[in-house]
Swiss-Prot record:
Gene3D superfamilies: DD-peptidase/beta-lactamase superfamily (3.40.710.10), Metalloproteases ('zincins'), catalytic domain (3.30.2010.10). It comes from Staphylococcus aureus (strain N315). It comes from the Bacteria. Keywords: Antibiotic resistance. Pfam families: Peptidase_M56 (PF05569), Transpeptidase (PF00905). This is Methicillin resistance mecR1 protein.
């Protein structure tokens, strides 16, 4: 999750920069004017897009399963004999899935991230100390106060808490303070430039204060401290500073007489030339911002009089286009596209009394009473958490195969290819019944190979199967990218039993019969186990099914998560104890 977020954050912000660059270029071309620098704040928003949860978005996924998992069908395997009427022939068979340990990598990434942020924080503290030095060394002047009043009058901006001073510890004009603003001019500027030139410089700094540019700059500083690894923030910050200076120049030029425009440009150029090479306030400048390309500014000032007035409608359209680009990419780049949690709110009866059955496991149990249309749930948060379906997915893979005529009602046989598998039950010809009873992987892998990926995606979307993510390896259902919650397992069984799916009713009945564990006069007991073995440890156990009585049907799903021994057999044992306690079997 962490690596996905960091990666998607960079991609999202880079895409946003590309869009802004394109829109900005077209805007300049067709309006002969500049856009507001505030458009670059969208880049900050884009870095947070991966944190936004979106439901049922699936086509574009950076799945950790794609990067971290490698399936082995020749490593260790586990066989569990299941309790029940057909225990002599029904086994919970599963093979191991090797996964690289991602926890250490995650911790390492987190450590590097925090270390980088701490370095940025240290640099920020250094900047604040430099600012304190500048403030303490700055001197007030009645002359500058008079110039400030003149400039405020010209700009019609009478902010109460604003002061002006000069300091020999800076080489270019600066503005401090988010609430109480302080303009500080370099001593060399005050000593060298004339009254008009100083007023031009003050007008420019006042424009920064009036536009609240320092606030936007501080936002960028905070984001750069947190997302220091993201090159998009450095690119966009440079562009924002350049545009910010031009916007402030434009604001000043608006209030000056036409014949003063050239003199204003000359003053800006002169102020830049007066910079000292011996003053080091880089840290403070990093915090305060507004570095710019002086050549671009002078060129803009020189061409200002020939530029048409800004078109407000076109500017609004440009902003809307950039904002829409964020909305479009948001669902595509959300780190939650895998949807490891099923987002739903259902009314249910709590089954807290079942806790002893799940001792030693993080587990959940979901029961749906068809007649009463009511859910009963143990551990509701866990029942919404999605996990690999493992062999429980074979139910729906079989239905897809029937729909694509890979299987028929009269012919479900597949010949064994003589490959030696870990279980003797797998080393023989199979049909639907035997493959379901013994969870024969190769049988369903063969079916899956004959299904196009887009077909599988369509089926999963049609029946609303979990996160619908099949971007992992070829066994995407076996501790890979495809995930589903216990509540969704129950809903799927209900829809299948009620024939509310696209599939043929007779095909559904054929699959149901292959899952039947017990048939009595008073009830029919149907179920399927699933076991996820990760690095030779049973970490994920499923048992899903239903009990059909004469006047009702009860759908259930039990899931177990643990360090080891969380398997389908254990899930079935717990399920049957619960169902017996409820007097359903």
């Amino acid at each position: 999750m962490l690596s996905s977020f960091l990666m998607l954050s960079i991609i999202s912000s880079l895409l946003t920069i590309c869009v802004i660059f394109l829109v900005r270029m077209l805007y300049i071309k067709y309006t002969q004017n500049i856009m507001s620098h505030k458009i670059w704040l969208l880049v900050l928003v884009s870095t947070l897009i991966p944190l936004i949860p979106f439901y049922k978005i699936s086509n574009f996924t950076f799945s950790k399963d794609m990067m971290n998992r490698n399936v082995s069908d020749t490593t260790s395997s586990v066989s569990h004999m299941l309790d029940g009427q057909q225990s002599s022939v029904t086994k919970d068979l599963a093979i191991n899935v090797n996964q690289f340990e991602t926890s250490n990598i995650t911790y390492m990434i987190l450590l590097i991230w925090v270390f980088g942020s701490l370095l940025c924080l240290f640099y920020m503290i250094k900047a604040f100390r430099q600012i304190d030095v500048i403030k303490s060394s700055s001197l007030e002047s009645s002359y500058l106060n008079e110039r400030l009043k003149v400039c405020q009058s010209k700009m019609q901006f009478y902010k109460k808490h604003i002061t002006i001073s000069y300091s020999s510890n800076i080489d270019n004009p600066m503005v401090f303070g988010l609430v109480k603003s302080q303009i500080v001019l370099p001593t060399v500027v005050v000593e060298t430039m004339n009254d008009k030139e100083i007023e031009y410089i003050i007008l420019h700094e006042l424009s920064h204060v009036k536009s609240h540019d320092l606030i936007f700059n501080q936002l960028y500083v905070v984001f750069k401290m947190i997302f220091w690894f993201n090159p998009a923030l450095y690119i966009s910050k440079t562009m924002m500073d350049n545009d910010c200076e031009k916007v402030c120049d434009r604001n000043v030029l608006k209030i000056l007489n036409r014949h003063e425009h050239i003199r204003y440009g000359e003053s800006i150029l002169k102020c830049s030339i007066l910079k000292s090479q011996h003053i080091n306030n880089v840290a403070a400048q990093y915090l305060l911002g507004f570095n710019s390309n002086i050549k671009e500014r002078v060129k803009y000032i020189a061409l200002y009089d020939s530029m048409p007035k800004p078109n407000r409608n076109k500017r609004i359209v440009a902003y809307i286009v950039c904002s829409i680009s964020l909305l479009i990419q948001a669902p595509l780049l959300s780190a939650h596209v895998q949807q490891d949690k099923y987002e739903t709110n259902v009314s249910y009866k709590k089954l807290n009394q079942l806790a002893p059955y799940f001792k030693g496991f993080d587990g959940s149990f979901v029961l749906y009473n068809e007649r009463e249309q009511a859910y009963s749930i143990y551990n509701e948060p866990e029942s919404k958490q999605r996990y690999s379906p493992n062999s429980t997915y074979k139910i729906y893979l079989a239905l897809m195969a029937f729909d694509q005529n890979l299987l028929s009602l009269n012919h479900t046989e597949q010949q064994w290819d003589k490959h030696q598998y870990p279980f003797k039950e797998w080393n023989q010809d199979q049909n639907l019944n035997s493959s379901m009873k013994y969870s024969v992987n190769w049988y369903y892998e063969n079916l899956n190979k004959h299904l196009r990926q887009d077909e599988v995606k369509s089926y999963l979307d049609l029946i609303e199967y979990g996160n619908e993510e099949i971007s992992g390896n070829e066994n995407y259902w076996n501790e890979s990218s495809l995930k589903i919650s216990a509540i969704e397992q129950v809903n799927l069984l209900k829809n299948m039993k009620q024939h509310n799916m696209h599939f043929d009713n007779k095909a559904i009945e054929k699959v149901e019969n292959s899952m039947t564990l017990k048939q009595k006069d008073t009830y029919k007991y149907v179920g399927k186990t699933g076991t996820g073995i990760v690095n030779h440890k049973e970490a994920n156990g499923w048992f899903v099914g239903y009990v059909e009585t004469k006047d009702n049907t009860y759908y259930f799903a039990t899931h177990l998560k643990g360090e080891d021994n969380a398997n389908g057999e254990k899930a079935q044992q717990i399920s049957e104890r619960i169902l017996k306690e409820m007097e359903l079997i």
